[in-house]
UniProtKB/Swiss-Prot annotation:
It is a multi-pass membrane protein. Pfam families: DoxX. This is Uncharacterized protein HI_0886. Keywords: Cell membrane, Membrane, Transmembrane, Transmembrane helix. One of its GO terms (cellular component) is plasma membrane. Disulfide bonds: none annotated. The chain crosses the membrane at residues 9-29, 49-69, 107-127. Signal peptide: none annotated. PANTHER family: BLL4328 PROTEIN, OXIDOREDUCTASE CATD-RELATED. Belongs to the DoxX family.
Amino acid sequence: MNNLEKYRPYFLAFLRIVVAYMFILHGTAKFLEFPISMTGGNGAVGDPMLLVAGVIEIVGSILLILGLFTRQAAFILSVEMAYAYFFLHVAGKGNLFFPIANGGELALLYSLLFLYFVFSGAGACALDNKFFKK
């Protein structure tokens, strides 16, 4: 298994980029109605909180894809998704310990993934490595 250790930074970069790409789609769906509409085709989301969430998701995801300010962006995104889980899913439907019952499993998973990036950093192929060398 020690032979796999040399690939850790590259897998971490791959995971970071894929998760950020998947998450940016949530932001564009809220803010731009792309690739799907979150309002049933009735124009951009009118709820100011959803618009703010969409901007945070787009900007944060771009930073993660680039690997720039990775830990800070991941922290903000983790807090956003924890907020979504506790104050939207749990508060709306209950079932704190059963995310599948309140529809919050995706929010909880994203929150934990972003929290992982807070502690692990960006991995390989990140602008953080170029601009903020130790």
